[in-house]
């Protein structure tokens, strides 16, 4: 684990560390924010750490990740945890979405396992859920968002990441992986949670 450099500063309300090593998530979050907010990834903040996700709920994992970075960097930050919940699989993979097929976080294997477990199952309903924890002055604030949809039988599309290639959101005939980032943001669970985060940050700036 590497600590933030001594000259690292992130004290402005509109500059926040995003407690993730997932560059795809950083790109999505940045696409949802305007120029009034600056988001730093862990790497950009000089922090090299793999934060554990030991809990059974998205909320607890988001809080844990945000709290770890807040204590480490001594500055405001936020974290998110996202899970795919499939009704026919009793809401699996859920909090284990990134490690569904093993600790190596291989999403090709994760998708293959998901499709195998759903083989011949006619109930394909699923939803993505995102929970964001914003930590300011040691206080945690929770924001969530969800996107309902369907798991298709075969992968489609080359964009996105994770389970995007097999998830079709309600109201669309495309998988997330077939959409541009702008299209995906029309449905995105992450966008819905991020919009709540932004609204809260704007109220703080007015105070």
Located regions from the model:
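Anionic-ligand binding patches
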Residues: 14-17, 23-207
């Amino acid at each position: 684990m590497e600590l933030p450099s001594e000259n690292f500063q992130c004290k402005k309300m509109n500059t926040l560390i995003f407690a993730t090593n997932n560059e795809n998530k950083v790109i999505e979050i940045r696409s949802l924010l305007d120029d009034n907010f600056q988001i730093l990834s862990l790497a950009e903040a000089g922090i090299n750490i793999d934060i554990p996700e030991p809990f059974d709920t998205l909320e607890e994992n988001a809080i844990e990740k945000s709290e770890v970075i807040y204590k480490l960097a001594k500055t405001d930050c936020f974290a998110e945890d996202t899970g795919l919940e499939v009704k026919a699989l009793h809401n699996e993979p859920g909090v284990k979405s990134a490690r569904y097929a093993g600790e190596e976080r291989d999403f090709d294997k994760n998708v293959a396992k998901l499709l195998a477990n759903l083989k011949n199952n006619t109930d394909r309903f699923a939803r993505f859920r995102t929970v964001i924890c914003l930590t300011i002055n040691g206080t945690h604030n929770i924001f969530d968002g969800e996107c309902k949809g369907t798991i298709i039988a075969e992968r489609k599309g080359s964009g996105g990441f994770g389970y995007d290639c097999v998830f079709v959101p309600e109201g669309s005939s495309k998988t997330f992986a077939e959409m541009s980032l702008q299209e995906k943001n029309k449905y995105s669970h992450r966008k819905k949670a991020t919009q709540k985060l932004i609204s809260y940050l704007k109220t703080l700036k007015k105070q």
